Regions:
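Short loop/turn motifs that connect adjacent beta-strands in outer-membrane beta-barrel proteins
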Residues: 26-42, 79-94, 125-130, 167-171
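Outer-membrane beta-barrel "beta-signal"
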Residues: 70-78, 194-207
Length: 207
């Protein structure tokens, strides 16, 4: 009787030890997955950029020009995966980016205007140095015809690459290169577009 009681107590102790081991192990795994998945947590980004670039009007004379811009940016970065993290080289954020643009165009007569860009961007977020690529299009309204003799409304498709550095967890500085095209998409018979190589520098905050 005494021996059977000892065997029963030993079995209960083994089951309890196994239960404790499992209960301490599972939360650690869950924490690791949650921590990795947090690399792509949903955020709202607010930022500002300054840009300048040399361009060329694709008229007969190939007239040189330049474009300067002040940009205010809002980007929504949703979370697209849960649970098991992605491979390291794939970890990043997809963002829908909306930009308000104030632009100045060097021509005769000089022109300025307001515009709106809608872009899609992918940013790799594996460390504090974060490369990105982006592309989209916008529309720009100006106070003078751009180029001269054309229209005051133009479309602005653009693609680019960038690199940002996280100064703090929610604060980043960075730069971009964009190939920027401006034209009226056939609203006039001639429609000479402007191709510009833009360099941008700015700062952003994640919320």
């Amino acid at each position: 009787m005494f021996a059977s009681t000892l065997i029963t107590l030993a079995a209960c102790g083994a089951i309890q030890a196994t239960t404790l081991h499992v209960s301490t192990h599972v939360p650690q795994t869950a924490q690791a997955i949650t921590r990795d998945a947090g690399l792509n947590s949903a955020t709202l980004e607010i930022g500002g950029l300054l840009s300048w670039g040399n361009g060329k009007v694709y008229d007969v004379a190939r007239t040189p020009t330049s474009i300067s811009q002040v940009i205010v940016r809002v980007a929504w970065q949703p979370q697209f995966y849960r649970g098991r993290p992605l491979p390291m080289w794939m970890r990043g954020k997809v963002a829908l980016v909306v930009e308000g643009v104030k632009a100045w165009i060097d021509q005769d007569p000089s022109a300025s205007g307001l515009g709106l860009n809608v872009l899609f961007r992918y940013t790799w977020t594996t460390n504090r140095w974060q490369p990105m690529f982006l592309g989209g299009a916008g529309i720009l309204y100006t106070d003078e015809q751009v180029p001269p003799g054309e229209t005051t409304r133009n479309f602005t498709p653009q693609v680019g690459l960038g690199l940002q550095y996280l100064v703090q967890d929610e604060l980043a500085i960075g730069g971009e290169y964009r190939f920027h095209h401006l034209s009226n998409k056939g609203a006039t018979e001639t429609n000479p577009g402007i191709n510009t190589h833009l360099i941008l520098f700015g700062v952003s905050w994640d919320r």
